[in-house]
Amino acid sequence: MAKVLFSLFSFLFLIIGVSAQFQFFEQMFNGQQQQHQRQPQDVPSDSQWYQDNYDRAHCTSYLCPGTLSCVAFPHHCPCAHPTYEEKFELADGNAICISKGGFKAGEAARKVELARKGLI
């Protein structure tokens, strides 16, 4: 009788152990598939995404092509990455965004002005 109970308990523990291993592998592999399904898709490499957003943007003044911001004048357009770029207004009423490049505030604009004058 003790031998039968021992065999029965051994078999039961074996079944529980195998079941736990299969659940582990099922969770591990199915969990990765579900995780991949939840990731957003990359935007397409053509310009259609930009063109669609540009066409849907409503602006009664000037729509900035780089940021799709609506401003009164083209030189009011913000830089797309203000943390890394500094806006510099040119004499002809246009504006450009230039990399700060680790310079202190105003330094990038000063370098553009020096280059415009042919000094650097």
Curated annotation (Swiss-Prot):
Keyword rRNA-binding: no
Keyword entries, A-Z: Signal
Family indicated by similarity: Belongs to the LCL2 family.
Function comment: Probable component of the endoplasmic reticulum-associated degradation (ERAD) pathway.
Domain of life of the source: Eukaryota
Keyword Signal part of the UniProt annotation: yes
Organism: Botryotinia fuckeliana (strain B05.10)
Residues annotated as signal peptide: 1-20
Any one GO BP annotation for this protein: ERAD pathway
Record protein name field: Long chronological lifespan protein 2
